[in-house]
């Protein structure tokens, strides 16, 4: 995990005490020697343009090593997003590994109401895309009989 160690050291150097947590999540969160495609969440106390610029180079190197761009947010965004990203937070809570700093995962509370709303939104969005794709690609009434 050479790339991960380098990233953490760079984040600590650039953000100092402002770096709250680095959390791995997703399917490779608990794979000890994951070489790439490791999802990370970086949480800071405050986040502004200067902070984003400071961490841009290390994150660009991380992405160049075939990793997804980390989710970067401040502490306020972390606590105010449980309703909007209910599915994502529920997934993170089930499969994560604290890489650095404070373990914020126990603070996650996903209300079932918001989880249902996000699931419904996702399903309805997919249904709309499916219908639009059907409308744009149907060539004859014979094709309808296949459905």
Where are these regions (language model features)?
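Metal-dependent nucleotidyltransferase catalytic core
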Residues: 1-16, 30-36, 40-85
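Conserved NTP/Mg2+-binding pocket subregion across the NTase superfamily
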Residues: 59-146
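Residues immediately flanking
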Residues: 27, 44-46, 96, 102
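Residue-identity detector for threonine
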Residues: 20, 44-46, 107, 121
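Short gly/ser-rich loop at a beta-strand->alpha-helix junction or flexible surface loop bordering the NTP-binding
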Residues: 20-28
